[in-house]
Amino acid sequence: MTSCQVAEDPIKKVAIFGGTHGNELTGVFLVKHWLENNTEIQRTGLEVKPFITNPRAVEKCTRYIDCDLNRVFDPENLGKRMSEDLPYEVRRAQEISRLFGPKDSEDSYDIIFDLHNTTSNMGCTLILEDSRNDFLIQMFHYIKTSLAPLPCYVYLIEHPSLKYATTRSIAKYPVGIEVGPQPQGVLRADILDQMRKMIKHALDFIHNFNEGKEFPPCAIEVYKIMEKVDYPRNESGEIAAIIHPKLQDQDWKPLHPGDPVFLTLDGKTIPLGGDCTVYPVFVNEAAYYEKKEAFAKTTKLTLNAKGIHSSLH
């Protein structure tokens, strides 16, 4: 073994979460299907558990009941004394942490795939929380290569103030899967097929790794979050301009200083400020209006991973 190779523990337990947001229907539909027939997600020697994370929100086809489940897996919320007064999603987070965590414990699941849809034109997106995770960089490289020529983007949310406490973060290896564009409360066959393929390739990678396949050093292109941009607002705090037509549906495309970003109702164009090119993501995402986020700025980086193999081989 050289210094470019790292031995990693084999993967034993994997969960696939759907319905973290109850109106993002691809994950809901796939997980419900796999709960009835799990043949396509089974791999030898691997426990793969499909799970509906927010059943009440799924039932009502809404993002959440009391608060966003994908933002409450922080120590404060997970440590609150259980009571009926707690928001439903905080109680649910504690249940999920007990079932699949707790984080950093011997009992926690090795990998959690959390399935999401976006109304933004983001295509196939993998969400990475740690830029130094050789195993996940290798997995994402495998998925991207397997999906080609279909593009698959990697969104790195590692940031001191913008990273959030995700549902999947209780696993050793948290993986967000985001596919769009798809309206809330709607199923599209093309989007479902893409998400299904992403999970297939991810499970194939895990199986190959567990069987002793060595993965040589690799590099992937990622888009790292820099800043969230709110809509222009008037004195009452109401939105005063909308996403400019030239920015709409242009996720992942370079956005230069001076390029149109917003358009007011009296026809005034508001351009991008600053002095550097950025790459916008979650452009005009429906769920982010309440979060005061018109889009997020990212910068493009290359991440390198050492070669990996299973410590059993």
From Swiss-Prot:
Q: Does the keyword NAD apply?
A: no
Positions annotated as active site in the UniProt record: 178 (proton donor/acceptor)
The Gene Ontology CC terms held by the record are: cytosol; nucleus
> What keywords sit in the KW lines?
Cytoplasm, Hydrolase, Metal-binding, Nucleus, Zinc
Instruction: Specify the domain of life of the species encoding this protein.
Output: Eukaryota
Q: What is the top EC class of this enzyme, as a single word? A: hydrolase
Which EC number(s) does UniProt give? 3.5.1.15
Give residue numbers for the site Transition state stabilizer: 63
Instruction: Give one Pfam hit by family name.
Output: AstE_AspA_hybrid
Task: State the reactions this protein catalyses.
Answer: an N-acyl-L-aspartate + H2O = a carboxylate + L-aspartate; N-acetyl-L-aspartate + H2O = L-aspartate + acetate
Q: What is its main location?
A: cytoplasm
Q: Which InterPro entries match?
A: AspA/AstE_fam, Aspartoacylase, AstE_AspA_cat, Aste_AspA_hybrid_dom
Q: Which PANTHER family match?
A: ASPARTOACYLASE
Homology family: Belongs to the AspA/AstE family. Aspartoacylase subfamily.
Q: Whom does it interact with, and what assembly results?
A: Homodimer.
What this protein is reported to do is described as: Catalyzes the deacetylation of N-acetylaspartic acid (NAA) to produce acetate and L-aspartate. NAA occurs in high concentration in brain and its hydrolysis NAA plays a significant part in the maintenance of intact white matter. In other tissues it acts as a scavenger of NAA from body fluids.
The entry's protein name is: Aspartoacylase
Organism equals Sus scrofa
